[in-house]
Curated annotation (Swiss-Prot):
The keyword Transferase applies. S-adenosyl-L-methionine binds at residues 102, 127, 154, 176. Catalyzes the formation of N(7)-methylguanine at position 46 (m7G46) in tRNA. The keyword tRNA processing applies. PROSITE patterns: SAM_MT_TRMB. Keywords: Methyltransferase, S-adenosyl-L-methionine, Transferase, tRNA processing. This is tRNA (guanine-N(7)-)-methyltransferase. PANTHER family: 3-DEOXY-D-MANNO-OCTULOSONIC-ACID TRANSFERASE/TRNA GUANINE-N 7 - -METHYLTRANSFERASE (PTHR23417), PENTACOTRIPEPTIDE-REPEAT REGION OF PRORP DOMAIN-CONTAINING PROTEIN (PTHR23417:SF14). Substrate binds at residues 180, 212, 273-276. Signal peptide: none annotated. Pathway: tRNA modification; N(7)-methylguanine-tRNA biosynthesis. It is an enzyme of class 2 (transferase). The gene is trmB.
Length: 294
């Protein structure tokens, strides 16, 4: 999920609330369920019209790549009783190859490149935003990929539906940072999700995470480093402030007490997307994490 597009700011808060209200009203008028009620989500759902090219991609490729596991029209929840198990994986992908799940696949650049490079591995892209799903459909369809599927699903619900040992790897690259202190509970990396991912991973399976936000890197360490059942495989030593500073206060972090943390070399299975290029051009440091199930 590319956070430069999806992160709310103070100036957009009123507009965001209006859009959310409009979405609920629109869903009710169409007979569709309003999404999620009071659940804490890692994203803000905004309706976005597809341009002609993306609409054609959706119409052409959705039946091939988009999983039909949603609770209903317009819902990002998993339908009641759905189980993501080996039988479903075998039926959907047509084989029992290892499965890699990317949370927040954005425009699909990374997951499509990975699927094309590794035809003996199955891939599932999780993305909630219509344009991102449509663009991933377009890229996958152009290459006629057989080993990729897409689910427009709230990621934590998919992992709750997954059976033990069904997934080889999970990727979460550049998630929405939710920089305001009061929004940290919306960050996708949370203990509850980590527990579900741990259960769903195969033995020695890994969760790969990357962020270009220093404060989010600290958050990842706080959530993941002391969890039973995960080992931080990082071999690099990185110095980070040990306190959160919140949105707009990044300059204050340099004066805070720092500590050393273990992080990984850049994952060579991640393509250099336009989003990552922008972060590097802005002088941001990329933090990579590899947490292995033990």
């Amino acid at each position: 999920m590319q956070h430069d597009e999806n992160t709310p700011t103070d100036g957009r808060k009123t507009e965001e609330n209006a859009q959310n209200i409009q979405h609920v009203q629109s869903a009710a008028a169409d007979g569709r369920p309003a999404l999620y009620g009071r659940k804490v989500l890692s994203f803000v759902r905004r309706s976005a019209r597809l341009d002609a090219r993306l609409q054609r991609a959706w119409d052409t490729y959705a039946d091939t790549y988009l999983l039909n596991i949603n609770a209903g029209e317009g819902s990002l929840g998993v339908r009641e009783g759905f189980v993501f198990d080996q039988a479903y994986i075998r039926e959907t992908w047509g084989n029992t190859n290892p499965l890699i799940v990317e949370i927040g696949s954005g425009q699909g650049e990374n997951v499509v490149a990975a699927a094309a490079a590794r035809p003996d591995v199955n891939f599932l892209a999780l993305e909630v935003y219509d344009p991102g799903v449509a663009h991933t459909l377009l890229l996958a369809g152009k290459q006629n990929l057989k080993n990729l599927r897409i689910a427009q699903i709230n990621a934590p619900e998919l992992f709750k539906a997954a059976v033990d040992g069904s997934i080889a790897e999970v990727w979460t690259f550049f998630p929405d940072p939710w920089p305001k202190m009061r929004h940290h509970k919306r960050r996708i990396v949370q203990p509850e999700l980590a527990a579900d991912i741990h259960r769903a991973l195969t033995d020695e399976g890994v969760w790969r995470i990357a962020t270009d936000i220093e404060d989010y890197a600290l958050h990842v360490h706080e959530v993941m480093d002391e969890l039973d059942g995960f080992h931080n495989d990082g071999a690099l030593t990185v110095s980070l402030p040990v306190e959160h500073v919140g949105k707009g206060n990044a300059d204050e972090a340099a004066a805070l007490r720092h500590a050393d943390f273990a992080e990984s070399e850049r994952f060579d299975g991640r393509v250099l997307t336009n989003f990552e290029k922008k972060g590097l051009a802005a002088g941001r440091v990329i933090h990579d994490f590899t947490y292995r199930r033990v």
